[in-house]
C-alpha cells in the first residue's frame, strides 16, 4: 500500500469530486484520498471551485465524464437538485443535497449533513434529545441539521436567520418539522437580539450553521453579545477552518462546552464515502490525520 499519488493513479482510477466556493480550505480531499489509499480503493478525490453560474454546466460535464460521484457545499446545496435524476427521501425532505452518486448514469442526490452533525454531538458526549436547541442559519446544512434533530427527538428548535433569500426556505423547514415530527420549530429574525437572548437562555445548545466565521467572514460572529452565553451551554459551529471561530473563542471565555465543525465534516464524509464505495470509511485512521 502506498500514499504516493503517482503510484496510485492508473487508467482505471475513478474520479470523485467536491464542488463549492470558497473551496481551497477544504479538508475533504485529504480525508477521502487517505481513506481510499488505506483501503486500497482505486479512486481519487479532487476539489473544484464552482458557484451558481457554473453549476449546471459542471453537472452536465460530470455526467458526460461518468464521475462516480461528488460532494456539494455552499452555495450549491439547495440548487443542484434541478440537474439530478433522483433524490433520496432525506434529501427530498430537507430540500438540499451534499452528496451525489452516479449509478449507471443515474444521478441521485443525498444529504448527510444532518446525520453527520448528530453523530458528532453523540461522539462528543452531548445528548440533546428531548431538549431545546437554538440555531443560526437557513441554508442546506442548517436545514439538514434542523430536520435530522427533529427526527431524532429534539423537543424544540428555534431558528434564527437574516431576512434574505434563505428566509423563505427556513419558513418551509419550520412547516415541515411541525407537520411531520413531534418537534416544535419556530423562526425568528436574527436582528431580534432580545428574542435571540431568550431562546438561547432556554436551550441546551446554540449552533452556528452559517458561513460566518470562515473566509471571507473570518473573525466575525452572529452573536451580538457574549453575555447571552452561560457556562452550562453547549456552543457548536459547523465551520471547521479555522478550528476555533470567533464564536467558539467567545464561548470558551464564557465557560461553555464547545464543538467545532470537524466532527460533523468527518461523519457526513464517512456516510458519503459509504454511498460511493459501499465500504466503511476507516474513521479512527482518518481521525489521527485530521484531529
Curated annotation (Swiss-Prot):
Top-level EC class: oxidoreductase
InterPro entries reported in the protein's UniProt record: Aminoacid_DH-like_N_sf, NAD(P)-bd_dom_sf, SDH_C, Shikimate_DH, Shikimate_DH-bd_N, Shikimate_DH_fam
Superkingdom classification of source: Bacteria
Residues binding NAD(+), per UniProt: 161-164
Catalytic activity: shikimate + NADP(+) = 3-dehydroshikimate + NADPH + H(+)
Residue sites binding NADP(+) per the record: 137-141, 214, 238, 261
A molecular function (GO) term: NADP binding
UniProt entry tagged with the keyword Iron-sulfur: no
Pathway: Metabolic intermediate biosynthesis; chorismate biosynthesis; chorismate from D-erythrose 4-phosphate and phosphoenolpyruvate: step 4/7
Keywords, in A-Z order: Amino-acid biosynthesis, Aromatic amino acid biosynthesis, NADP, Oxidoreductase
Classification via PANTHER family: BIFUNCTIONAL 3-DEHYDROQUINATE DEHYDRATASE_SHIKIMATE DEHYDROGENASE, CHLOROPLASTIC (PTHR21089:SF1), SHIKIMATE DEHYDROGENASE (PTHR21089)
Entry protein name: Shikimate dehydrogenase (NADP(+))
Organism: Listeria monocytogenes serovar 1/2a (strain ATCC BAA-679 / EGD-e)
